[in-house]
A protein has these predicted regions:
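Phosphate-handling catalytic cores of nucleic-acid transaction enzymes
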Residues: 2-464
Length: 464
C-alpha cells in the first residue's frame, strides 16, 4: 500500500507543481481564482476570453464552473461514504461595481444552454401545434388517421429559467428531471422575492433545494402534487457591492442561507480597457463542444421514470487526502470565535465534495481522465478552489460588518494599521473621540469579525 501511495505521489507531483505555476501567473495578472483547477482546454478558453473581451478572470471562471455543474446536473453524484451523496448544486454570486463586466462572462458561459433551449423551444412549438390539431379531432377521427387515441401533450426540454415562483419552478423541473439553472442578472431580485407570497416559504424552498431534499409542490389549480425526488437547481447571478447588505437582511444571516452562497469578488482596481483583439473562432466552438458533451451524456431512467445517477466514489488516496484536509479545516473552526465564519466553513465542507465531482467530470469531458472514481488530483484542485471561496466569503462578511459600523467606528477601523497593539488602538480612538472603555468593548466584540487577536495586546485586521 505504501509503494502504491509513493507511486501515486510521484505521478501527481508534477501536475500539482504545474498547477501552482499556473495560479501564480494568474495572480500576477490580478486574479486570485485558481484557474489550474480546470482542464487545459478550459484554461485556454478562459485566457482567450479574458484577453480578447477584457472579462475579469474570476467572473468567467466562476461562470464556467457553474455551467459545468449545470451540464452534469442529476446525471452524476459524488459518494463520500455510504448514504452520503452530493449533487453538483452551486449557488453563485458575482459581486462588483456597475460596469465591472459581471454579466457578459455569464452570457458567454451559458450560451450553449441558451442555444439548446432555443432549439428545444422551436421543436416544442411545432409539436404543440400538431398536438392541438389532434385534440381538435374526435377520438374516432384520430384513430382513423392512424394517430394515438389519447395523444400525449409535448414537453418543453430546457436548462435555464429566470424569474419564476417555486410552484412554477417545480412544474418545469418535473418535466426536466435532469436539472435546471436559475440565471438571474440581478440576484437582488431573487432574494427580494422570497417573501412575495407566503412569508418565508420561498426561502425555505431554496434551503431544501440546496441539500437536494425531496420537494412536494401542491398546485392551486390541480388536485395533484408535483413530487421531485432529488431536485437539482443551481443558481447564478450578479449583485452590486453596495447592496450586499440587502442579502443579509431578515433571517438570511441567522438561518445559514447566506452561507450557502459562493461569492466571487475580484479586486478590480481599474475599469476594464477595451481590447482590439478578436476572439479566435474556435474558442466558442470549443466551449460549445464541451457543454454539448455533457448535455449528450445518456441518463439511465428507471421504471418510475426517475433518473438513476452514476455514483462516483473516491479512490483510497483521494479519500485519505480529503479526510486530512477536513481534519485540518475542523481545527480552524475550533479556533474561530465568530459563529458566522464557522457556519461558512461548515457549508464549504459540503461544497468541496461537489467541487471534486465537477472537476473530475470536467477533466473527463476534456479527455484528461476517466470517471470511474474521483481521484487525488481532483481533490487537490478542489481544496484550492475551496480556499478561494473561503477567502471570498470572509471578505464579504467583513463588508457586511463594516456596513453596520457607526461613522466613528469606521473611522477607527480605517486609521488602524494592518497589525496594531492595544496602545496604538487607544491612540487612534483618542483622535476619534472614543472613550478607552468603549474601544476595548469594540475590539472584544469584533474579534473574529473585524480583528484577529494574535497574542496579548496585539491584533491584526482581518480584511487588510
Amino acid at each position: 500500500m505504501t509503494a502504491l501511495n509513493n507511486n501515486k505521489e510521484t505521478s501527481i507531483n508534477p501536475m500539482i507543481i504545474m498547477d501552482k505555476a499556473i495560479d501564480m501567473s494568474t495572480r500576477l495578472s490580478g486574479s486570485q481564482f485558481p484557474v489550474s483547477i480546470f482542464p487545459a482546454k478550459i484554461q485556454r478558453i478562459i485566457k482567450e476570453v479574458h484577453e480578447c473581451h477584457s472579462f475579469p478572470t474570476d467572473y468567467i471562471s466562476a461562470a464556467i464552473l457553474t455551467a459545468l455543474a449545470v451540464g452534469i446536473g442529476n446525471t452524476h453524484l459524488a459518494q463520500m461514504k455510504q448514504g452520503w451523496l452530493e449533487s453538483p448544486i452551486l449557488y453563485m454570486a458575482l459581486i462588483g461595481r456597475p460596469g465591472a463586466n459581471k454579466s457578459h462572462p455569464l452570457s458567454f458561459a451559458m450560451k450553449p444552454f441558451l442555444d439548446y433551449d432555443y432549439e428545444q423551444n422551436k421543436l416544442f412549438e411545432e409539436q404543440y401545434s400538431k398536438f392541438e390539431e389532434k385534440m381538435c379531432m374526435s377520438r374516432k377521427e384520430r384513430i382513423e388517421n392512424g394517430e394515438d387515441g389519447f395523444p400525449q401533450e409535448p414537453v418543453r426540454k430546457r436548462f435555464l429559467v429566470s424569474d419564476v415562483t417555486p410552484e412554477g419552478l417545480s412544474y418545469i423541473h418535473a418535466q426536466n428531471k435532469r436539472g435546471l439553472c436559475l440565471w438571474t442578472d440581478e440576484l437582488s431580485a431573487w432574494f427580494k422575492n422570497f417573501n412575495r407570497y407566503n412569508n418565508g416559504s420561498e426561502e425555505q424552498f431554496w434551503l431544501s433545494i440546496f441539500s437536494a431534499k425531496t420537494t412536494i409542490s401542491d398546485r392551486r389549480s390541480s388536485k395533484s402534487s408535483i413530487f421531485i425526488k432529488r431536485p437539482y437547481i443551481s443558481v447564478i447571478g450578479t449583485i452590486q457591492k453596495k447592496i450586499l447588505s440587502e442579502l443579509a437582511k431578515g433571517e438570511r444571516s441567522s438561518n445559514g442561507f447566506i452561507d450557502r452562497i459562493l461569492f466571487v469578488m475580484p479586486n478590480l482596481q481599474q475599469k476594464a480597457r477595451w481590447s482590439d483583439r478578436e476572439l479566435p473562432d474556435n474558442i466558442e466552438r470549443d466551449w460549445q463542444a464541451i457543454i454539448q458533451h455533457l448535455i449528450d451524456m445518456e441518463c439511465q431512467i428507471n421504471e418510475q421514470q426517475e433518473i438513476e445517477p452514476h455514483v462516483l466514489s473516491f479512490t483510497e488516496e483521494a479519500k485519505a487526502r480529503l479526510y486530512e484536509w477536513q481534519h485540518h479545516f475542523s481545527e480552524q473552526c475550533d479556533n474561530e470565535t465568530n459563529d458566522t465564519i464557522v457556519s461558512i466553513y461548515c457549508k464549504l465542507e459540503i461544497y468541496i465534495i461537489r467541487f471534486c465531482l465537477i472537476i473530475q467530470l470536467a477533466r473527463w469531458t476534456c479527455g484528461e481522465c476517466d470517471k470511474e472514481a474521483i481521484d487525488l488530483l481532483s481533490v487537490e484542485r478542489a481544496i484550492r478552489l475551496t480556499e478561494y471561496f473561503k477567502n471570498s466569503a470572509i471578505s464579504v462578511q467583513n463588508i457586511l460588518n463594516e456596513n453596520m459600523l457607526t461613522a466613528q467606528q469606521q473611522a477607527i477601523v480605517n486609521h488602524l494599521p494592518a497589525t496594531f497593539t492595544t496602545a496604538q488602538a487607544h491612540d487612534v480612538a483618542k483622535e476619534n473621540d472614543m472613550k478607552p472603555r468603549t474601544l476595548e468593548r469594540f475590539l472584544n466584540d469584533n474579534i473574529g469579525v473585524l480583528f484577529r487577536k494574535e497574542k496579548h495586546g496585539e491584533y491584526s485586521k482581518i480584511n487588510s
